[in-house]
Amino acid sequence: MYYCISFTYKNTDIALREKLSFSNETKKSEFLKIISTHENIEECLVISTCNRVEIVAFVKMACAEFIVKSLALLCDVDKDILLEKADIFEDSGAIHHLFSVASSLDSLVVGETQIAGQLKDAFAFAVKNSFCGVHLSRAVHSAFKCATKVRNETQISKKPISVASVAVAKAKELADLTQKKAVVIGAGEMGELAAKHLIAAGAKVIILNRDLQKAKDLCERLGVLSEYDSLENLKKYLNQYEFFFSATNAPNAIITNSLIEELPYKRYFFDIAVPRDIDINENENISVFAVDDLEIVVQKNLALREQEARMAYGIIGRETSEFFRYLNDLALMPIIKAIRLQAKEYADKQLEIALKKGYLKKSDKEEARKLIHQVFKAFLHMPTVNLKHLQGKMQSDTVINAMRYVFDLKNNLEGLNQYKCEFDMENNDEIY
């Protein structure tokens, strides 16, 4: 069954999410290797962003305690705290949750499209490292399909808002950004988003990054309203400008009290990184806004999106039902093939017995075989037609299980591609 363990801004604070975050691929790979050793876990992937850690799996049976215990040990967190905080979803609930996440209905900022790219990256990583197979492939691709339908059929993402854009919106409330210079620390995806929103607001941006080439490349994409420098010069910039947006992947805070000088004007620091980049004392001239603080601005946008969200949830509900109908349909064809194969095997076996006992001449063997197969074909025609008519219907799962029991089809199904998936798991260019 499908299984999801979720830690988000809804059930955890930023301090706990910092500890749980998978800021590098080595840590993510280590965790997936650990949990994939469990006999009940067949496939798994991890989505890790500043607002959520989602463990999505296909399992034989529920195993939340093992997964949470493994996460607790790796991240040095109390297991009982995680079990208390975790939201756990099973089967249809897990698929509905995954579709909601992909469609940005579960995001801090409903309607932002950044999560789709993050899910894509998480899926690609799991496929590349052999943690993900056909079960999660079906689920993730269906999640992308659902997200596309939500975007196309509602207005929820027509004006996309990310955490970075919310930070810039908050800055615009505090001052007119036109012609001001803002410092963006980090040249990754979140830093680039912040820079784009700042430029759109009329500001000029300075990109600071450890990798100077990456900062240069970003500035080339941003255009003439941007410049760049090395992160080594951070202190100089911190004590020269008013607005700072920090979005690095550093494991510890990079902006601390030791770098801050007292100045006679106000400075605003927006920490949009997890783990946090900023650990400084606030005073009358220094204000710090962390990821969780931005929810205040987010609430202003939620009212405008509630109606679209209701429409989107309707789509997600229908797509969830459609997904499980699709899985049932996948199971029907192997049942039909297995029954026909079983009939052929019994016919051939009885034919050989008849030949051995002299009930049938060898010269008549092929004619007898054709006759027997025609009889079975005619006999199985109506059951086959009726089974095909069950495709997409609610009772198909009950009938499939009954057919497996009545015809003892367990062994016959082993040689059939029961879990056929139309997505190419070998070619990374096609799995998206």
From Swiss-Prot:
Chain's gene name: hemA
Alphabetic keyword roster: NADP, Oxidoreductase, Porphyrin biosynthesis
Enzyme class: oxidoreductase
UniProt record similarity statement: Belongs to the glutamyl-tRNA reductase family.
EC number of the protein: 1.2.1.70
Native source species: Campylobacter jejuni subsp. doylei (strain ATCC BAA-1458 / RM4099 / 269.97)
Binding site for substrate: T49, C50, N51, R52, S107, E112, T113, Q114, Q118
Highest rank taxon of the organism: Bacteria
Keyword match Ribonucleoprotein: no
SUPFAM superfamilies: Glutamyl tRNA-reductase catalytic, N-terminal domain, Glutamyl tRNA-reductase dimerization domain, NAD(P)-binding Rossmann-fold domains
Domain notes: Possesses an unusual extended V-shaped dimeric structure with each monomer consisting of three distinct domains arranged along a curved 'spinal' alpha-helix. The N-terminal catalytic domain specifically recognizes the glutamate moiety of the substrate. The second domain is the NADPH-binding domain, and the third C-terminal domain is responsible for dimerization.
Active site, per annotation: C50 (nucleophile)
HAMAP family tied to this protein: Glu_tRNA_reductase
Site-annotated residues for Important for activity: H97
Name this protein carries in UniProt: Glutamyl-tRNA reductase
GO MF assignments: glutamyl-tRNA reductase activity; NADP binding
Binding residues for NADP(+): G186, A187, G188, E189, M190, G191
Self-association and partners: Homodimer.
